[in-house]
Amino acid sequence: LKSLGTKSLKNPEELEIEDITNSNLSKEMDNSGNASFYYLKHAIEMVQSLPKATLVTGPICKKSWAESGHHYPGQTEFLAESCNAKDVGMLFTAKSPITGWRFNTLLATTHIPLKEVPKHLNKNLIFSKLDQLSNFAKKFKNNPHLKIAGLNPHAGENGLLGLEETAWMKEALKQWSELNPDIKIEGPMSPDSCWISSAKAWQKKISDKNDGILAMYHDQGLIPVKVIASNYSVNTTLGLPFVRTSPDH
């Protein structure tokens, strides 16, 4: 699929298909992975050459990419490199069909092993992600209320179950809040209760204290997103020179 004009988006009679080199899809991971990699590469080049173009991607098999020699953790990381984007964010957003409430979750870290997460977290990263999350949340509310999940169970329980929250996270959040007085933030919160108000807002009552949540790692954020907003959430990459989205999968 090459492109769709907005006027023909509802019921298109004709679609323009981009003709690129065929690939014989099979169970051979190197063949299939190589094809999907170069299809995405070609799509990125097309979007960069067109004014106001956007990109929608489907799922890939990360192992197939690796087997074919393309060693990227995911499409987000390849997109960032291709666009020379130094600071991108993986955000999941959905609108409740019941209440109309907007559900936003941003990941501080993305496709890395769980044991590597603490090594990647620091004050500068949290500042950057809160900037991204607040800017996105402002599209729907002028003075958003953000929640930040802790890294450890019960947000470390005052150092008993982990030191990151008391060692630097609390102070980092305080400093960011002082620089952004129009944004209300809450955290680091116990991760097991951070998304409770999201579930309520999705089903019954819109929350005025939950306009965005910052998760520390992939599964911490994606599990509640998929449980609460399955089949409705969309992944969007913040920080690219164009809009890129992907159905949550």
Role assignments for model-derived ranges:
Residues 1-249:
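Anion-binding alpha/beta catalytic cores of soluble intermediary-metabolism enzymes, centered on
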